[in-house]
Amino acid sequence: MRFSPLPFAFLVGLSILGLSGCRESNDSVGTGSQAAPAGTDPVPTTTGKKRIILLNNTESPFWDAARAGIAKAAEDLKLEENGFTASMDSNTNGEEGQIEKLRQYGTQSDIAAVIISPTSATNAAIADELKNLKEKGIIIGTFDSDLDTKFQETREFYVGTNNTRGGEVLGAAAKGLQPDGGEYVQFVGYGSMQNAVQRMDGFTSAAGDKFTQKGRRTDDTDPNRARDNVRDSIDQNSSLSVLVGIWSYNAPAIVDVVKEKNMRDKFTIVTFDAEPIAIEQMSEGMIDAMVVQNPFGMGYDSVRYVYSKLRGDAATIAEMFPNMKDSGGNIRDTGLKIVAPDEGSPLTPEMFKEFGPSVQFLKLSEFKAWLKEYNLTGS
């Protein structure tokens, strides 16, 4: 996978996006049409513009940075001037919710592209609806999480994290924090999503033989269930010593329960993503390591590729995907950060050098400064 240059590409002008992270979940960028309420279908444009839609898997603060990336791409590429809009649509009803939204897209004549973070990598109905859209001439891509290999011929590209590597980075962090090993449970929303499977498998692989997995608990993106899963895991496993959050909201769910039980000293806590509350929780000493993705880059690059394809811009496509025709060449890696507390952490940059330049080690204060510079509250 190729590391995206976008962390540098969006340095200029991102300061104007302070409000972008607060957009409604399907706010259309580059158009005067009215946006629908969060979690509903985007309103078809009445201006004759073609729409580029990014459909997420569930609503979360994680997507705010992706919306900022979409907005910046719309501005840089002058979408409105050239007859296009770009927006994110939020799915709030699991696999069935995505299937229904894809069916509705098929009835709308103004859609140029659909880029999806599929709730299930292996759901044939999702793949079938994407295929139906593709047959109508709509460009299909994935971001954040990919389809299973057997369905990948349906989509042209994937933009996002190398999720196996992300899991390995988190596993390496756990190993560095607790070198003698221990028992762990991994917490996630949907166990069938490719990013979930790859992250959990990657964690297990990198953590090594001294660590023993005691479970993989799913919550269907219900925050109450997420906390219940943590409580049950702690109550049922007296030797448990590592709690692993795989999706963004799992971090605060873990911290809530550990605080509730007054058991911080018993657990190493390692998590994915950096919701604003999780950043504050690390500041309070409640999280030991975070693997942070680049959702801004996911949003920006997805729009950039689609617009280049629509315009016949072969040079940009070749720059973004130089090996597009090769196996795996239609995947664009947007990179990772591993974030550690400022004080008292045994983690060092050298522990993560094996993962190459696409993985950047930052102390929490450095990460906060990076967010502040670009007017982001999380990533």
For each feature predicted by the language model, list its residue ranges.
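Bacterial N-terminal signal peptides that target proteins for export
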Residues: 1-9
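A residue-level marker of the well-folded mature domains of exported/periplasmic proteins
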Residues: 22-379
